Amino acid sequence: MAPQPRRLIAPDAREDDAELSLRPLALADFTGQASARANLKVFIEAAKARREALDHVLFWGPPGLGKTTLAQIVARELGVNFRSTSGPVIAKAGDLAAQLTGLEDRDVLFIDEIHRLNPAVEEILYPAMEDFQLDLIIGEGPGARSVKIDLAKFTLIGATTRAGLLTTPLRDRFGIPIRLEYYTVEELECIVRRGARVLSIPIADEGANEIARRARGTPRIAGRLLRRVRDFAAVDGDPEITRAVADRALRLLDVDHIGLDQMDRRFLQTIALSFGGGPVGVETIAAALSEPRDAIEDIIEPYLIQQGFLQRTPRGRMLTSHAFRHLGLAEPPREKTQFQLFSEGGEE
């Protein structure tokens, strides 16, 4: 199968140099996630006052909300070294040992996609997190022996979009679990205006608002949309990004007024037109769209659920009346499922 082109509003797409330049460098410059920022500030100041390593931190939530950025900020605020890797890269115990033995006291090791760690590697990580020791088996067969290696007292920061896939023993070893939430339009406006200042882009408040409304609650997408709108404005000779300029550019980019793109609409239309609005299983949807199940569950569905377009029920995915209205389609009559009857009769 030919590789699919990158969606402009894909929150998990790899960041380029321009996106990296928009990242805030300090907690005070970080917009949004007020509760997470306030708590982190307390934990960081307490650790610095005690001259101890910060307790292990787990950031979890949808992609593009700032998990990596916050991890870097934590290391910078602590005044320590920052080392970064990801779960799939640490294939064997030796890979993990190489990362851990290179750390100094209070350094930060960041593991992105920590839910994808090899189970054998995860077992070795437990004593490293709890006792700051590595338990390695050297050799094979009768001559094999166990070796303990003392480690510096470090801070592990894990990031995941799927906290439910973490094993309980690993999840319980993080003393500071922090869930990141989607951003409000007002917060994204601030992020867009800051990005415009960094990139020297003239932008009106209404233009920033228009981009923020279509950024799906995600700073990474907001920055990407800002740069693409800038391109249209430059080619069209517009001196400033106004609401009209942003609207025209985003319409040409096929991003509608609430941030849905062609893939989102295709997903909704498939359920509406091919499966009568549901319920329909995610595997069936994946086959119909020729998309992997993980992409549907991690990338497409979360925002649609948050916007009230989609329900996950025991029998499968179902579109809401809101989704049919957005698509401009008549909602077909459907028999009430047992799930819906119970939802109407009590708490959801």
Swiss-Prot record:
Subunit details: Homohexamer. Forms an RuvA(8)-RuvB(12)-Holliday junction (HJ) complex. HJ DNA is sandwiched between 2 RuvA tetramers; dsDNA enters through RuvA and exits via RuvB. An RuvB hexamer assembles on each DNA strand where it exits the tetramer. Each RuvB hexamer is contacted by two RuvA subunits (via domain III) on 2 adjacent RuvB subunits; this complex drives branch migration. In the full resolvosome a probable DNA-RuvA(4)-RuvB(12)-RuvC(2) complex forms which resolves the HJ.
GO MF annotation list: ATP binding; ATP hydrolysis activity; four-way junction DNA binding; four-way junction helicase activity
Region Small ATPAse domain (RuvB-S): start-end pairs: 184-254
Reaction catalysed by this enzyme: ATP + H2O = ADP + phosphate + H(+)
Role noted for this protein: The RuvA-RuvB-RuvC complex processes Holliday junction (HJ) DNA during genetic recombination and DNA repair, while the RuvA-RuvB complex plays an important role in the rescue of blocked DNA replication forks via replication fork reversal (RFR). RuvA specifically binds to HJ cruciform DNA, conferring on it an open structure. The RuvB hexamer acts as an ATP-dependent pump, pulling dsDNA into and through the RuvAB complex. RuvB forms 2 homohexamers on either side of HJ DNA bound by 1 or 2 RuvA tetramers; 4 subunits per hexamer contact DNA at a time.
GO cellular component terms, A-Z: cytoplasm; Holliday junction resolvase complex
Main location: cytoplasm
Protein's recorded name: Holliday junction branch migration complex subunit RuvB
Matching InterPro entries: AAA+_ATPase (IPR003593), AAA_lid_4 (IPR041445), CbxX/CfxQ (IPR000641), DNA_helicase_Holl-junc_RuvB (IPR004605), P-loop_NTPase (IPR027417), RuvB-like_N (IPR008824), RuvB_C (IPR008823), WH-like_DNA-bd_sf (IPR036388)
Keywords of the record: ATP-binding, Cytoplasm, DNA damage, DNA recombination, DNA repair, DNA-binding, Hydrolase, Nucleotide-binding
Annotated ATP binding sites: L22, R23, G64, K67, T68, T69, E130, D131, F132, R173, Y183, R220
Chain intervals for the UniProt region annotation (Large ATPase domain (RuvB-L)): 1-183
Subcellular location: Cytoplasm
Ligand binding (DNA): R293, R312, R317
Cross-referenced SMART domains: AAA
GO biological process, one term: DNA recombination
EC number: 3.6.4.-
The keyword DNA-binding belongs to this UniProt entry's keyword annotation: yes
Pfam families associated with the record: AAA_lid_4, RuvB_C, RuvB_N
The UniProt record lists the keyword Nucleotide-binding: yes
Region (Head domain (RuvB-H)): 257-348
